[in-house]
Each structure stands twice: as C-alpha cells, then as structure tokens.
Design a protein with these regions (language model features):
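Acidic/polar loop-and-plug regions of large Gram-negative outer-membrane beta-barrel proteins
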Residues: 68, 76-136, 159-170
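Active-site loops and adjacent core secondary-structure elements that bind or stabilize anionic groups
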Residues: 147
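N-terminal periplasmic accessory domains that precede
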Residues: 1-14, 25-31
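Transmembrane beta-barrel wall of Gram-negative outer-membrane proteins
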Residues: 17-48, 53-91, 126, 130-139
Length: 170
C-alpha cells in the first residue's frame, strides 16, 4: 500500500454499520503507475456514532495518501501522509460485579443529560499525523538502499471531572 507505484489502478467504497449505531464509510483510489512513472494512492474514511458502551461516541476521520515517482530505473521517491483526527467519549470507571449484574456490561456511570444534551464526564480528542519521504535506490541486482525522513506532530487532550486539559506550548 505504501508504494503507490505497485498498486493496481482502481478504487473502492465500503460502508459498515455496527449493531450499536456506529457508521464507517471508506473510500480508496489508486491511479496505478502512470506513463510518467508516478502514482497516487489515497484512502479516506469517516466513522461516527455511538460507542459500544452506553454514553460513549466516536467522531473520527482517517486519511492515507501516497505519492510515488520513479526517477529512473534505479531510483524512486515516495511521499506518504497518514493521520486520524478523532474525538470520543469514554467510560472512566470500572464497574463492580454488582453493577454489571444489575445494569449490564455496557453500563456507564460517567455520563448523563444536562440541559437536554448528552454530557460525558470523559472526552478525548487527538490528531498526530505522520509525513514521510522515502528514497529507494537499486544499486545493483544484490544491493538496495532505502532511506527515510519523517516528521510527526500532534495535538490532543481531554476532559474529566476536574475540567478540560490540553497541553500548551508554555
């Protein structure tokens, strides 16, 4: 998947729905290797809906992009970007055996309604994309050299009973 020049030309779409109300749509497309020796592969998805545990949810996107270019018969460059910005509610506290017996395993005591809107005591958000540049060199029939440079930057945080938390640059 990461070497777009090796992918077949074409695309696909897939939609998945869980029994607890989560919908995920995924689209992918690859140009295949074009006449100029380059190729692009992209995959994007979106997930939204309720979580398996009561009072939890997910709102997430994900993306993958790969651009590859054969510079000549011995050298190829690729650029890859991948990431998944997301936000989700969670259950923070473990249930006692008595709570599981009385309310079931999906019970979540960390949420409720406030002014008519769902309020979850614990929410997280996160996005840490990665970007990579790779060079592949076929030195001869027995020797190949691969080199990579990448960067990853991210931001995330969450909320809890003590308020919101997000790291700062200070």
């Amino acid at each position: 998947v990461t070497k777009a020049t090796e992918a077949q030309k074409g695309g696909s779409f897939m939609s998945q729905y869980s029994d607890y109300g989560q919908l995920k749509n995924t689209f992918s497309y690859s140009t295949g290797k074009m006449k100029d020796g380059s190729a692009v592969t992209a995959v994007v998805s979106n997930t939204n809906g309720d979580g398996y545990v009561d009072g939890t949810y997910v709102r997430a996107n994900s993306y993958f992009l790969s651009y590859a270019k054969d510079l000549n018969k011995d050298h190829m460059l690729t650029f890859t970007a991948i990431g998944s910005p997301q936000e989700h509610g969670q259950r923070d506290r473990m249930l006692t055996p008595e709570e599981v017996e009385e309310y079931g395993g999906k019970y979540n005591k960390d949420w409720g309604y406030y002014n008519g809107e769902m309020l979850n005591q614990r929410n997280n958000y996160y996005h840490k994309p990665q970007f990579a540049l790779n060079h592949y060199w076929d030195v001869n029939d027995k020797t190949q050299v691969a080199s990579s440079a990448y960067v990853s930057v991210g931001k995330g945080g969450g909320s809890g009973p003590l308020g919101d938390y997000a790291p700062t640059d200070e």
